[in-house]
Amino acid sequence: RIISAVNDYHFIWEGRVHRVGASAGITLIDDNNHQAAEVMSQADIACYASKNGGRGRVTVYEPQQAAAHSERAAMSLDEQWRMIKENQLMMMAHGVASPRIPEARNLWLISLKLWSCEGEIIDEQTFRRSFSDPALSHAFDRRVFHEFFQQAAKAVASKGISIALPLSVAGLSSATLVNDLLEQLENSPLPPRLLHLIIPAEAILDHAESVQKLRLAGCRIILSQVGRDLQIFNSLKANMADYLLLDGELCANVQGNLMDEMLITIIQGHAQRLGMKTIAGPVVLPLVMDTLSGIGVDLIYGDVIADAQPLDLLVNSSYFAIN
């Protein structure tokens, strides 16, 4: 009935009637199938089958769909290269703010989305996991930074907002790529302090020299994927990075999970000792925001702070920051 109601809705825009459609994927939750990650994956696969079948479909998950989905997800090397070189790339901006002053936003985390050759939207992490050649990571990083400096850096500088872009471990390990990045930064109007780079925390151990080179140039470093493995703090020292970005899984249900609350409290203590700030998210519920605020987390992002929006829309709005 929900699907039918959406399909029957008449959306009028500028005097024209536009057709609205919806698709749905359904899976069974019972004693034998109750792991959240698995259930969500099944629902996603069923939903994909609905969208692939046409407008206004409802599909119930069946195991054979997973195999079919995996076959579709397996991209050829040529397709991967074509997506990096030619297909549309969208940068989505996620506002970051203190949970104690959620209205004050001047840092925006950037997530990436690409269009496949079949027109399907693929997020950065899913796309990177499909890479069958390390050179693809280098090429993807180059594409991201080239587009940012060519299309957005000037507007970002005029707004005075800080932008955080992802940099892969493979990209960080390439001296040529790091040098090219710094050259583009030097030739752009963007002050280096406004460019934040999101780097997996594990990279700090093997690529400390490259990270330090970026920091000395004025860039801010955000170490991501900080979660349940606290061994990283045996190697981290003060002035190695500026921020710690917590795993999303760690704060998703922190308001009702004492173990997660304790882990975040420990991470917060390490961050303070090292002179780094913590970032947690995505946060949807005000109750989660309040819990993180009580722990002392410095910054959060998610729907509770601001809806994600395309970077070009953000920099072309009337919003600006004093930074």
Residue ranges and their predicted role:
Residues R1-W13, Q42-D44, V144-K154:
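Alpha-helical scaffold within the catalytic cores of cyclic-nucleotide enzymes
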Residues I2, A24, V39-S50, V58, ...:
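Regulatory helix in c-di-GMP signaling enzymes, encompassing the GGDEF I-site helix
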Residues V6-A22, K51, E120, V156-I161:
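Catalytic core regions of nucleotide second-messenger enzymes
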Residues N7, R16, H94, K113-E120, ...:
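EAL-family c-di-GMP phosphodiesterase catalytic domain
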Residues E14, I29-R55, Q125, V226, ...:
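Catalytic-core segments of nucleotide cyclases and related cyclic-nucleotide turnover enzymes
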Residues D30, I45, A49-A93, E124, ...:
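C-di-GMP signaling machinery
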Residues V58, W108, L136-E209, P282:
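Catalytic core of bacterial c-di-GMP phosphodiesterases, primarily the EAL and HD-GYP domains
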Residues R72-S130, P166, Y301, A306-P310:
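Active-site core of bacterial EAL-family cyclic-dinucleotide phosphodiesterase domains
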